[in-house]
């Protein structure tokens, strides 16, 4: 397997339509930003300030459902990585966008969290756009209470050839830990994330996050069966 190492660096350069880590995704207008629906249960309180109960003494709740955005990780311009993909697993053109519920590992509160092991479900989204329009614009998303952008400052991405088992951010790596490979035979890491103190990105004491996919699914551009593994030492 030909692993592709990823290096990121702060920049003042315009990254619209380019590969970049963090920042805002340049999604085409017809591609919606991925959200997860969250249901909150709130205890009903009476005029006396005490929880309201039914005839059997059970507390009464009301449910509120709202959308929670996934964290944007990066977008990869396929032309940047195609020369390094010797096995032809990745598309040759277009843009690939990565989103996941990783706020917890960035030291932030969030009602959603990526699974530690197994099927990623709706907590990971990979969006591939083959024909990218010329008029891309960064997606606009702000916190309701402050009006500030939810996105971190964007960093430029550079790519290079790497060993099969990467020790850095990477694409197409093969996890070397038995705890990751044994429950996921035949999977590779479409994206591997390592800890970075600059972003307060930590996987407990020390670890890695693997967003896993079968090579055949990747060739078919099928991202519905992604798995994830948070490995910690």
What are these model-derived regions, one by one?
Residues 1-233:
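Preference for intrinsically disordered or flexible, low-complexity segments
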């Amino acid at each position: 397997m030909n692993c592709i190492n990823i290096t990121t660096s702060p920049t003042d350069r315009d990254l619209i339509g380019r590969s970049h880590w963090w920042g805002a995704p340049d999604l085409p207008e017809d591609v919606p930003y991925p959200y997860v629906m969250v249901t909150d249960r709130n205890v009903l309180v009476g005029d006396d300030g005490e929880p309201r109960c039914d005839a059997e003494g059970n507390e009464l709740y009301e449910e509120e459902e709202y959308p929670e955005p996934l964290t944007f990780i990066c977008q990869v311009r396929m032309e940047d990585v195609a020369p390094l993909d010797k096995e032809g697993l990745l598309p040759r053109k277009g843009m690939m966008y990565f989103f996941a519920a990783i706020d917890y590992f960035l030291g932030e509160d969030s009602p959603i969290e990526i699974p530690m092991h197994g099927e990623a479900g709706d907590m990971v989204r990979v969006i591939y756009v083959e024909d990218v329009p010329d008029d891309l614009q960064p997606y606009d998303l702000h916190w309701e209470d402050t009006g500030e952008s939810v996105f971190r400052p964007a960093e430029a991405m550079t790519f290079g050839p790497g060993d099969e088992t990467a020790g850095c951010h990477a694409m197409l790596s093969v996890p070397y830990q038995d705890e990751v490979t044994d429950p996921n035979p035949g999977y590779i890491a479409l994206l591997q994330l390592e800890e970075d103190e600059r972003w307060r990105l930590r996987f407990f004491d020390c670890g890695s996050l693997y967003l896993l996919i079968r090579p055949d699914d990747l060739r078919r551009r099928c991202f519905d069966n992604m798995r994830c593994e948070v490995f910690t030492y």
